[in-house]
Amino acid sequence: MKRTKKYPFLTLQRQRFHLNFENASSAAGIPAERDFYRWAWSALKSGYRRADISLILLDEEEARAYNRDYRGKDYATNVLSFALNEGEILPCQVSEKLYGDLIICPQVVLKEAAEQGKTPERHFAHLTIHGVLHLMGYDHIEDDEAEIMEAEEIRLMLAAGFPNPYQEDGH
C-alpha cells in the first residue's frame, strides 16, 4: 500500500481546526479550497489551538449587502471578518478556540490584483490571512495597530512563499 504524503494543512482534524468553505461566487480563477485552508491555518496556528471558521466566497451584490448592512458602507469590499468571540482575547494571546466568519468577494479581489500587478493567488492569500488576523483581534484603525498587523501579514506571507503584500511590484 502506497502512503500518501502528509501535508500539515490536510491533517488539521488533529489540530481541531475546521474551515467551512463555500464558494457561492460565479467568478473564475479562484484558488483551490485547500489553498484557503493552508492560508487560514498559517495565520491561526500562532494564536489558537482550535478554530471553527466559515469562509464564503460571494459575488459583488451579496458582498455589498453585507458591507452595507454590517458596516454602513454601500459597496462590495474584498474581505469582511465577523469574529464571534470578539473582545475575549488580545492579539497574539493563545486561546482555546476561535469562532468567526469570513466573506471574500472574488470579483473585487481579482480586480485589485490586476490593478496592483499581483497574481490572484498572492492577493487571495493575503486577504485570507488579513481576514483571519482580524478574527484574531488584529486591527488597522490606529497607526500603531496597523503597524503590528502589517508586520504579521508580511511575516506570514513570506513564510507562505509570497512577497511582501504591501509592495505592488512583487519585490
From Swiss-Prot:
GO CC list: cytoplasm
Q: Where in the cell is it found?
A: Cytoplasm
The molecular function terms of the Gene Ontology recorded here are: metalloendopeptidase activity; RNA endonuclease activity; zinc ion binding
Entry's family note = Belongs to the endoribonuclease YbeY family.
Q: Mind telling me which InterPro entries this protein's record contains?
A: MetalPrtase_cat_dom_sf_prd, YbeY, YbeY_CS
Decide whether keyword Metal-binding is in the record.
yes
Recorded source organism is Neisseria meningitidis serogroup A / serotype 4A (strain DSM 15465 / Z2491)
Annotated Zn(2+) binding lies at 130, 134, 140
Q: What does this protein do?
A: Single strand-specific metallo-endoribonuclease involved in late-stage 70S ribosome quality control and in maturation of the 3' terminus of the 16S rRNA.
Q: What class of enzyme is it?
A: hydrolase
Q: What is a single Pfam family found in this protein's UniProt entry? A: YbeY
What are the required cofactors?
Zn(2+)
EC code(s) of this entry: 3.1.-.-
Cofactor annotation comment: Binds 1 zinc ion.
Which protein is depicted? Endoribonuclease YbeY
What keywords tag this UniProt record?
Answer: Cytoplasm, Endonuclease, Hydrolase, Metal-binding, Nuclease, Ribosome biogenesis, rRNA processing, Zinc
User: Which terms under GO biological process does the entry name?
Assistant: rRNA processing
Top-level lineage group: Bacteria
- Is Acetylation tagged as a keyword? no
